[in-house]
């Protein structure tokens, strides 16, 4: 009986975790996405904008992602369809490869949530 209760408890915990991940992966509403776009333009687009600059060159973040994915995924973050909010938030706070991290004094938790919602808006669930 104890083994059954332990298995049942583990199963319920896993179900709760899966439900929590599914809920966390949903992008926010129109207001949050609009705020996220504004913050993305200010903090992120300086390196990750999708349009080429003078001379046809992309910005450093977009260029490095274009080279990394070799056409399998867009280099421009705003064009991606595979970004989940938890991943976006992790990269904002910890940085990645050549990208710096951002402190809470630079991008607040609320702003980070908005940016994550904006970048996840096209993600297929």
Functional labels for PLM-detected ranges:
Residues 1-30, 123-125:
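N-terminal export/targeting leaders of redox proteins
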Residues 70-83, 87-122:
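Axial heme c-ligation environment in periplasmic c-type cytochrome domains
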Residues 30-31, 37-76, 90, 98, ...:
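Periplasmic/extracellular electron-transfer cofactor-ligation site
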